Amino acid sequence: MAESKPTPQSTFTGPIVVDPITRIEGHLRIMVEVENGKVKDAWSSSQLFRGLEIILKGRDPRDAQHFTQRACGVCTYVHALASSRCVDDAVKVSIPANARMMRNLVMASQYLHDHLVHFYHLHALDWVDVTAALKADPNKAAKLAASIAPARPGNSAKALKAVQDKLKAFVESGQLGIFTNAYFLGGHKAYYLPPEVDLIATAHYLEALHMQVKAASAMAILGGKNPHTQFTVVGGCSNYQGLTKDPLANYLALSKEVCQFVNECYIPDLLAVAGFYKDWGGIGGTSNYLAFGEFATDDSSPEKHLATSQFPSGVITGRDLGKVDNVDLGAIYEDVKYSWYAPGGDGKHPYDGVTDPKYTKLDDKDHYSWMKAPRYKGKAMEVGPLARTFIAYAKGQPDFKKVVDMVLGKLSVPATALHSTLGRTAARGIETAIVCANMEKWIKEMADSGAKDNTLCAKWEMPEESKGVGLADAPRGALSHWIRIKGKKIDNFQLVVPSTWNLGPRGAQGDKSPVEEALIGTPIADPKRPVEILRTVHAFDPCIACGVHVIEPETNEILKFKVC
């Protein structure tokens, strides 16, 4: 069906600044140097100082989860989970099986929610021209949808025509809202989906708005609320009602509805769009991958978490899928040489991390980010869906092998094509399909366990002095919270988050972060509308671009755009 084209490339030479790229979980500024239409160098700068580590110092360790969740309004639960796990480790408590399974189920809903939101509402519009859907033939679009996905009412010619009519009225009103000044308006060389695919994707974009609510509602059934769940406690969970029949039945019903959309829309849409952009299987790659693993069958310690996660943990270096190393938590450290922090913090393990801000100036390539630069044995590591997918695939995990091979077969590309922006985007769909395939089984396991024994929380005592680490593999990637307790209070707390791994600055040796590495070689068709930069950066899921400033190198004119 798909006819992939080569990505167009200009002859432009000069700098481009995209600022800000995201309005969630920090404001991101990307600066690149372009030579003959390709990115030659890149700098990733976080513009938001967080300071949660400073806020937490001196507080009760049990309070950590309530503060750290506020780092983000999208992937909120993962910080509660990592904080709870790090205090679990510090007090040396082994949580009950019911608590482990309930925590895992809420994480499963987080995956469904985040990956759907990312594909349709944060990333798809880097590839899909919404206004081009007006040129589509709804009958052809319906036939195309029937050829790539199971029959469903929303894919009928009548339903697609209704979406097209709604879109037409929206465009003719002149009030384009979130699409105002979008890169695809007026046409763009880098957008080349057939109008029928644009129409199908736009219809599912709208439907996905309802699906994300259902996924969030499922999280709230077990988590108490969304965002910012309130069911995790040190030693387990507090939602005893979540073990009973009606809440679990409601959770299952919502999950089934979301997963039906995943299988009938998300995966077919992903494959359809990717089929027209297959050359992006050679753009945006990195070299090294790290995963802490998730959905563990034994969470009694960080070591057990690493060893028993159903989404496996591991380390891959140099793209060598023939060798997956075990994770050594002692090999993680953070550099601050290129960050806006006082010197002396380089090479610090998170237990000993120092957060001492020292801002210089914006246009400073020696110090240019509020993020630190995490490294593993001296190497920058990509974390997230692609890292998890490669590690699971290389380890021969059956679920991953089945879905990855299906995707590779449908696209007729080798596994090496996944080292890319395209692969990073596909990996999210792969994971979502696997979560859906296991969801009903996981729910039944908890229901059966809870029917026999409803224990949800284990007893423990706060030590005078201790330390602990909480590991999680959030939808965006490897997350770790590190705590030192002294006098039963937080003496030091450090968060090493996925965006820090992926989007941080250079390390002490001048080595680029994953996003900086991934941007090298990216072709730019139109330097005033550099959608290609957004494609690669958004593939790491720093969320959504709300405003872009592109600096024209000769006149220093700042061109302002709002980007969807």
From Swiss-Prot:
Subunit field text: Heterodimer of a large and a small subunit.
Top EC group: oxidoreductase
Top-level taxon of origin: Bacteria
UniProt-recorded name of the protein: Periplasmic [NiFe] hydrogenase large subunit
Cofactors demanded by this protein: Ni(2+)
InterPro entries per the UniProt record, alphabetical: Ni-dep_hyd_lsu, Ni-dep_hyd_lsu_Ni_BS, NiFe-Hase_large, NiFe/NiFeSe_hydrgnase_LSU
EC identifiers of the protein: 1.12.2.1
Recorded catalytic activity of this chain's protein: 2 Fe(III)-[cytochrome c3] + H2 = 2 Fe(II)-[cytochrome c3] + 2 H(+)
Record keywords: Metal-binding, Nickel, Oxidoreductase, Periplasm
Propeptide position ranges: 550-564
Record has Oxidoreductase as a keyword: yes
Chain's gene name: hydB
Chain sites annotated for binding Ni(2+): 72, 75, 543, 546
Note accompanying the cofactor annotation: Binds 1 nickel ion per subunit.
Compartments (UniProt record): Periplasm
